[in-house]
């Protein structure tokens, strides 16, 4: 259980509130049509979804740049699909993906309802490893930006979750003591272990079906937050 009183809630964005997989798939579907690329979307996603997580982990750990992340994840997928796509096309596609991703606004089930519920009793914030220009548009376009008092992203912080410095920046921006806040996110490593390391409480939204870990309470649906807050 969580220790009360809690005054502030810190949310991750992608895979926690904003339906990344669905919005990403819709973006690629649109771009393959626009670029006249004959790519089977389902086959593409079978490769892309797990590879994207691998490349994001490398980016989070500082082993690759965001430019390399954006390019290499597509290049690797097309190579595995044995599709001949030029470097120029990959670069165009990569840039167009970033530009168009935030135009899709699907949220995860019960997201809006739980934000409205929590907004009545808590101050809410975002801590995200996503790119600043994209994450800002996601929040605005999906109609949830007004719920959050502060937004801290890795571009502005100069470090990525689970680095303690990004959490300290968020805690300072919120003006609270760590034990008064709870982090809710999908990544056990980046969100949960990172938050716990600086004294924040945590709720793990286990959308990736990680094994039982005992680090903190686990929820499988955003609606279950009501059991704790």
Model-derived features: positions:
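Structured helix-beta-strand junction loops
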Residues: 51, 120-121
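Short alpha-helical linear motifs
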Residues: 66-72, 112-120, 209
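Glycine-centered short loops/turns at secondary-structure junctions
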Residues: 121-122, 199
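Asp-based, Mg2+/Mn2+-dependent phosphohydrolase catalytic module
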Residues: 1-9, 22, 88, 112, ...
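N-terminal helical cap/lid subdomain that shapes the substrate entry/recognition surface
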Residues: 2-13, 17-108
């Amino acid at each position: 259980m969580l220790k009360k009183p809690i005054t502030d809630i810190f949310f991750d964005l992608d895979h926690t509130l904003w339906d990344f997989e669905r919005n990403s798939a819709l973006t690629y579907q649109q771009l393959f049509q626009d670029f006249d690329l004959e790519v089977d979307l389902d086959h593409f996603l079978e490769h892309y979804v797990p590879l994207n997580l691998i490349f994001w982990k490398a980016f989070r750990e500082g082993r690759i740049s965001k430019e390399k992340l954006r390019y290499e994840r597509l290049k690797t997928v097309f190579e595995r699909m044995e599709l001949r796509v030029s470097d120029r096309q990959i670069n165009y596609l990569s840039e167009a993906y970033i530009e168009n991703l935030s135009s899709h606004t699907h949220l995860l089930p019960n997201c809006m309802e739980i934000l409205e519920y929590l907004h009545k009793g808590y101050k809410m914030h975002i801590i995200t490893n996503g790119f600043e220009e994209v994450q800002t548009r996601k929040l605005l376009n999906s109609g949830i930006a007004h719920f959050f008092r502060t937004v801290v992203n890795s571009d502005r912080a100069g470090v990525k979750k689970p680095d303690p410095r990004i959490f300290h920046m968020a805690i300072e921006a919120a003006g609270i003591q760590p034990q008064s806040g709870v982090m809710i996110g999908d990544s056990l490593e980046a969100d949960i272990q990172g938050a716990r390391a600086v004294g924040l409480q945590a709720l793990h939204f286990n959308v990736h079906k990680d094994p039982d870990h005992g680090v903190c309470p686990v929820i499988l649906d955003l609606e279950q937050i009501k059991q704790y807050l």
